[in-house]
């Protein structure tokens, strides 16, 4: 459950002076950190982290295990850990930072953002004149033509800081 205060903001004194982190994020961070450190993760570590997040949503869901990954060609543990994080933290503002940390933004960011599958569904009949472009799978394209440059992995250093310290060098691509 997402958490928020019950206090009203009418007095303009609402705010928090401490970080807020969901327990699910802690568990996902743990699973990712263990895997990235060791290039593997035990089923025990999966059961005390990522699988708790999965099973909270659907107790009947098959737990993620090393055996499941081995039995299914095309699956790999790193991708599954990242996929679970993407799903659980959807729309919470983590995605861009995750893509930067994983250094996958150059492949993910230029991809089209797609919405619902429209063609071949009941919506195609109800909304006969869909004003949006669709892709080959019949999904509405929300945004396309996005670009990503290597320099976007780092922010530019503020010019006043560069002037204060001549030993600082501007981040690559921001010169």
Predicted regions and their residues:
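Acidic/polar-rich alpha-helix caps and helix-coil junctions
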Residues: 1-175
């Amino acid at each position: 459950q997402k958490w928020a205060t019950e206090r009203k903001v009418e007095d303009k004194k609402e705010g928090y002076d401490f970080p807020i982190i969901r327990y699910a994020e802690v568990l996902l961070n743990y699973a990712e950190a263990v895997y990235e450190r060791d290039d593997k993760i035990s089923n025990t570590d999966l059961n005390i982290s990522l699988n708790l997040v999965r099973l909270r949503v659907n107790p009947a869901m098959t737990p993620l295990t090393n055996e499941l990954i081995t039995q299914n060609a095309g699956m790999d543990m790193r991708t599954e850990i990242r996929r679970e994080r993407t799903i659980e933290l959807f729309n919470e503002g983590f995605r861009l930072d995750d893509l930067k940390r994983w250094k996958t933004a150059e492949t993910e960011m230029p991809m089209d953002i797609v919405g619902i599958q429209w063609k071949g569904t009941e919506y195609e009949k109800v909304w006969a004149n869909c004003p949006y472009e669709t892709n080959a799978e019949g999904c509405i394209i929300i945004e396309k033509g996005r670009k990503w440059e290597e320099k976007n992995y780092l922010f530019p250093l503020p010019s006043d800081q560069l002037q204060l310290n001549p030993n600082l060098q501007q981040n690559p691509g921001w010169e």
